[in-house]
């Protein structure tokens, strides 16, 4: 398998459905699978998955494992070359994964990749741009400098 898309879900049935529809379109033509760990949702997520997304590998936990442990569980069941961790409120453009994989293939020094996030109106989400976490950057954020100069290259 070339790519596994890992999604952790808890009480977000409708958002997850939209996310999965976009991921299924984005992986068309890619040797990929989708793994969803549901953290014991009671909102009908498991039934929705079985009805609308039967090809998605569903790991229905009987307890809320938490975000990190649920991601680790999915990764332990993947044998893919690449792993994409995706939040269930994400909608992917159709060509997004093809382009990302091409970049990864072109440069074997790349070990991980982030993305530029935009909201539903097309506006850039600054939380998708993070500087390297250093003590100095933590201090800038703590005392408010990052709010005074939000476009500074340090953060």
Model-derived segments and spans:
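Short beta-strand/loop segment that forms part of the nucleotide-sugar
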Residues: 31-40, 59-61
